Design a protein with these regions (language model features):
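Start-transfer (signal-anchor) and selected internal transmembrane alpha helices
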Residues: 1-24
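Extracytosolic helix-loop segments that constitute the early lumenal/periplasmic catalytic or substrate-binding loops
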Residues: 42-66, 74-75
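Transmembrane-helix motifs of polytopic, lipid-linked glycan transferases
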Residues: 90-115
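Specific aromatic-rich, kink-prone transmembrane helix
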Residues: 102, 106-109, 126, 145-169, ...
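Membrane-lumen/periplasm interface segments of specific transmembrane helices
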Residues: 21, 25, 32-35, 49, ...
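Hydrophobic/aromatic-rich transmembrane helices and adjacent perimembrane loops
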Residues: 273-317
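Short acidic/glycine- and proline-prone juxtamembrane loop motifs at membrane-interface regions
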Residues: 136-144
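Signature aromatic-anchored transmembrane alpha helix within multi-pass, membrane-resident enzymes
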Residues: 12-16, 204-209, 314-338
Length: 441
């Protein structure tokens, strides 16, 4: 079934609205110095290196550290041409927004042409406002943003039973992140269940082999320790079974909410099996951040469950009651969401310490090296060589800038810390509202 011009325009309008809203969320949070993590800075350093035609060196992880020795995400190099034109942290943030908007367009077109314009539009809105997308935007850029449009496109092809295209859109997922090999293998299993035995088996086997190559050869080859750094998180010290049983109520709530936003209709489609690999490594991982609905870990699940919902409702029209149920669940989760915060005028007020932060950064000359904490790290990468407190190693930064009032444990005696960590003599040249800047003589 082909989408009408009206349905394409409706999907485009929804995608554009999503881009505007999530762009606003990202830029306002950045301008207000909202601390999520240092991940956006890490990705900016990698993209900055790619844009300079170099290896993806991320000094935040350690001086000279090649990020391919941490996670295998070469797909982020696709942002480099845009970064060359507009080198800034905001470019990285907006890249994620654009990728999400593309996935919104794909899901909305699929929904309207298979379920009808009205119901399909409602499903498109539910997807655009789903908790996995909002949490990902709130957590700043992550490489899994590239998975959203790819999974949406692969899912749309599955609904149309165009299995060759399912494979075509699935294979690039292997370049997004190392764990996506499990998801691609699951796609192969779903194809096998659909009767595509040879194609499904080949995709599943190829994905597992590719993942093994990445984890056993490529990542260790770029890692100074010669190993994949995150293998120890699976099960932690107590084993996989014990870790799986930890915080079982929280994990169950995450799983239930993931399908509840589809009115549970997703459970009626084989495509929903794609959520299992992600849930498996998250719930077996000894990292509490993995277990809830926060952060970016549910982003890849959103296109999966909404495609499964559309597939189920398309094949079984009786399930269309799921749309209002999903909308109610989604609306409930909107109450304290980052999108809802845009309606609060206080969201746009300058934080009390903003001027002090800007002044501190202005005293670090362009091109200088600086060690910092996560308070301002995302604002310094574009024009400086940046190291992170804790992994600066043998570096001798010209400046050390800490936010000692952010509650993140940074040393309050910045000059003494710098001299002990890096030798030489450092003088405090700025101290205001918790931002302390020391300069090397």
């Amino acid at each position: 079934m082909t989408a009408t011009r009206t349905q394409h325009l409706l999907a485009a309008a929804l995608a554009l609205a999503s881009a505007v809203v999530y762009g606003a969320v990202s830029l306002v949070r950045f301008d207000r110095f909202t601390i999520a993590s240092f991940d956006n800075a890490i990705f900016e350093q990698a993209v900055k290196s790619y844009a300079g035609w170099g290896a993806p060196i991320v000094d935040i992880k350690g001086p000279g550290f090649n990020i391919l020795g941490d996670h295998f995400s070469p797909v982020t190099a696709l942002i480099a041409p845009f970064y060359r034109l507009l080198p800034s942290a905001q470019t990285i943030l907006l890249a994620q927004v654009v990728l999400i908007a593309v996935s919104v367009y794909v899901i909305a077109v699929l929904a309207t042409r298979t379920l009808g314009t009205l119901v399909g539009a409602a499903v498109g809105v539910a997807y655009a406002l789903s908790f996995g997308i909002q949490s990902a935007v709130e957590a700043d850029f992550h490489e899994v943003a590239f998975a959203a449009p790819l999974l949406a496109l692969a899912g749309a092809a599955y609904v149309d039973r165009r299995y060759g295209r399912v494979v075509m859109w699935s294979v690039p997922l292997l370049l997004v992140k190392e764990d996506m090999g499990l998801t691609v293998a699951a796609i192969g299993v779903v194809l096998w269940l659909a009767g595509e035995r040879r194609r499904g088996a080949a995709l599943a086997a190829g994905a597992i082999l590719a993942m093994a190559l990445v984890l056993l050869v490529i990542v260790p080859g770029f890692n100074a320790g010669g190993a994949y750094a995150y293998s120890g998180t699976l099960g932690g010290d107590r084993g996989v079974v014990a870790t799986l049983l930890d915080a079982s109520d929280r994990k169950l709530a995450t799983a239930v909410l993931t399908v509840a936003i589809t009115g549970f209709a997703a459970l009626a489609s084989p495509w929903v099996l794609l959520v299992l690999p992600t849930f498996a490594w998250r719930f077996a991982g000894d990292v509490p951040f993995y277990w809830g609905t926060e952060w970016h870990y549910s982003l890849v699940l959103m296109p999966i469950v909404f495609v499964a919902m559309i597939d189920a409702m398309h094949r079984r029209p009786v399930l269309r009651w799921a749309t209002p149920v999903g909308l109610v669940v989604g609306a409930f989760m909107m109450v304290s969401s980052p999108v809802a915060a845009l309606a609060d005028p206080a969201t746009y007020d300058d934080p009390p310490r903003a001027d002090a932060a800007r002044m501190a950064m202005s005293l670090v000359p362009t091109g200088a090296s600086v060690e910092t904490d996560i308070g301002l790290i995302g604002h310094l990468v574009t024009d400086h060589t940046v190291y992170w407190l804790g992994t600066s190693g043998s570096a001798t930064p010209q400046y050390v800038l800490f936010d000692v009032d952010a509650g993140i444990g940074s040393p309050r005696d910045v000059a003494a810390y710098a001299e002990q960590a890096h030798g030489g003599t450092y003088d405090v040249i700025y101290d205001r509202d918790g931002y302390i800047l020391a300069q090397r003589r």
